[in-house]
């Protein structure tokens, strides 16, 4: 894990002294920062790719294709989540994982009026921004989006913030970096199904990119 200015200096020294180095990372999942140093500040908030281009351009090449296939997410989830970062190579669902025998695959808007029914039917992990979310049902497992980073969950019910809802209405909505990254993490935890809880009166305003759970 490299996320401080001294770490980036170490990375530069490694590339300068070792012939074959492979570094792997996903700038879309920069959900938090442990430092606020001015050095290399312009490479914070998921901009570490620029560090490699500007400081290590002659020592390495950036490959955005080899690991662009997801072995976790359904294609619709890959498509939606990739829209959050249009400047990056979109991810696509792999062809080696056949989940066609699984019921209820993909992504769905879940009306608040069907909230409990959805939880009881599919028992998804509830992902929220933080513990202050009053819509979370305490009878079912819940966790913060940031804590779910790196996990693969069979089914997820995401509790979007207002800004996330705004983006689902208009993909040109500007999100601050932390919201953008946490939204990406929340969207991409589920292997089989992703539910997004939405107030009934908001459903007609959203982009019809996924079906509504009935």
Where do the protein language model's features map onto the residues?
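Conserved helicase motor core of SF1/SF2 NTP-dependent helicases
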Residues: 1-185, 189-214
């Amino acid at each position: 894990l490299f996320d401080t200015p001294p770490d980036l200096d170490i990375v530069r020294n490694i590339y300068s002294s070792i012939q074959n180095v492979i570094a792997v990372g996903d700038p879309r999942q920069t959900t938090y920062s442990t430092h606020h140093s001015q050095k290399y500040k312009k490479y914070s908030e998921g901009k570490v790719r620029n560090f490699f281009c500007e400081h290590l351009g002659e020592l390495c090449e950036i490959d955005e294709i080899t690991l662009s296939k997801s072995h976790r997410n359904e294609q619709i989830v890959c498509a939606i989540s990739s829209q959050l970062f249009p400047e990056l190579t979109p991810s696509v669902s792999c062809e080696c994982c056949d989940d066609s025998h699984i019921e209820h695959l993909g992504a769905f808007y879940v009306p608040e009026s069907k909230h409990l029914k959805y939880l009881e039917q599919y028992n998804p992990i509830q992902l929220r921004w933080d513990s202050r979310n009053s819509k979370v049902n305490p009878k079912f497992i819940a966790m913060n989006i940031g804590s779910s980073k790196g996990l693969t969950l069979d089914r997820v019910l995401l509790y979007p913030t207002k800004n996330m809802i705004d983006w689902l209405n208009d993909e040109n909505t500007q999100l601050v970096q932390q919201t953008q990254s946490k939204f990406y993490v929340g969207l991409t935890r589920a292997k089989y199904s992703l539910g997004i809880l939405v107030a009934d009166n908001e459903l007609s305003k959203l982009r019809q990119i996924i079906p509504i759970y009935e």
